[in-house]
Amino acid sequence: MTVQHTQDSQDLTRGSISRHLVRLAVPLVFGNILQEFYNTIDAFVVGRFAGQAEFAAIGVAGTVMNLFLFALVGGCTGFSVLFARAYGKEDMEELRRQELSALVVGLICTAVLMLIGLAGMQPLLSVLQTPVEIRAYTASYLRWIFLSLPAAFLYNLFASLLRASGDTKAALMVLAAAVTANLLLDFLFVAGLSGGIEGAAAATALTQLFSAVVCFIYLRCTHPELTLSRTDCSLSRSQLCTTMRFGLITSLHQCSLYLGKMLVQGAVNTAGTDVISAYTAGTRIEGFANSIGSSGSSATSILTAQNHGAGRRDRVRDIFRCSLCWLIGLGIFSAVIMYIFAPHTIRLLLGSEGNAFGPAVRYLRLVSLFYVFCFAGNTFTGYYSGTGRVMLPFLGAFGHISIRVVLSWLLFPYLGLNAVALATGIGWICANAFWSGMKLRERSVAHFV
């Protein structure tokens, strides 16, 4: 079946690879930055118009909420590889069957996550040693979030379909609308109606539903070839198993990264408020650089998956080389900017008078020296995901985060915050060594899995 490409979707199997990478990555970068704003809106509004206890509860709830959301987003990342591969083959019937399979698997897994969250919320808050005075607020917020998980999944599923077709702009526009809607609803429910933390949670839940509906309507209107119909309602066991495997591995990938960061935070928390503040400021600055690298990885994955699906093996190899050159260059550029402007960016967050300023600058400068490995690693993860070998990015990331956690805890008593930067860099180097070894092995056998 020949695909009639819409104005916003892209046939990525032809044309300039560099141009495709840039056109895919730029909206993804802005999307990641918008996501950072989206994640802080509730805290900002509650901090301004509710009590200190409710503000603290947002922080605790965010730790739990992000773990569940990372599981959903990670799963949809795996589904998007299957979508892009079918799109590259111009087989819309297969794509819609993959979509149905992802919908069934994803909704079942989301329902399980929702039930686990609702049933295990109180024990989890106890494990996190949530203070009694904010536990009720935290539980109230999380209850709304868990109930809105199906809407969050549907939005991410529809957005992954758009990205798989090369239409990354639409997903960005929907996210921008969601950020605006969440901000307005937060002010209405929290400031206007004095709803407190429950009002903020309701605003977030309604925004998730709004995002899913808008994304679905856009798909039906502009990408009818991606929309399910009654004739597509057939499932096979092999397809369900493939969908589950891709979704589960990429979900574990995202969750392992987040859990690793939480464990590193545990090591930092032993050093007192000043060091915690320094680490928080440093990682906030890192977040902007990481948004570029992760967007490059997603763009590489989409571009690779379409061409791999179309059988363009020579072009897949060119995509890897082009992405590696681009991301190494951007990694060097980001490292230079982070190193030179570390004092200025940290000063914006902490000022320059407190005890946290010096450790934050030293941390940011040390970790920046390794950023070329971070960015190069994004090429490998995008490439391997796009060719269907989703286990390799997971294994590399799991190894990286394990090294990062172990070395951070071992070296922190001697090196302080610099131990975390050094452990992070060593983890990136080891992950790249693993992926490079697998790439050399691939070249020797000249084989795609």
List where the protein language model places each region.
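Transmembrane helical elements of multi-pass membrane transporters/channels
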Residues: 23-42, 144, 178, 207-211, ...
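Transmembrane alpha-helix boundary and packing residues in multipass membrane permease domains
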Residues: 28, 32, 44, 81, ...
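Short runs within selected transmembrane alpha-helices of multi-pass transporters and secretion channels
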Residues: 76, 145-163, 174-179, 200-215, ...
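Short alpha-helical transmembrane segments in multi-pass integral membrane proteins
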Residues: 1-25, 83-148, 192-248, 304-370, ...
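Hydrophobic transmembrane alpha-helices of multi-pass small-molecule transporters
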Residues: 67-70, 182-186, 212-216, 288-291, ...
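Helix-terminus/linker motif at the lipid-water interface of multi-pass membrane proteins
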Residues: 33, 37-56, 125-132, 188-195, ...
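Residue-level signal for short hydrophobic patches within transmembrane helices
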Residues: 14, 18-37, 41, 64-71, ...
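Small-residue-rich hydrophobic transmembrane alpha-helices
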Residues: 55-115, 152-171, 278-342, 374-396
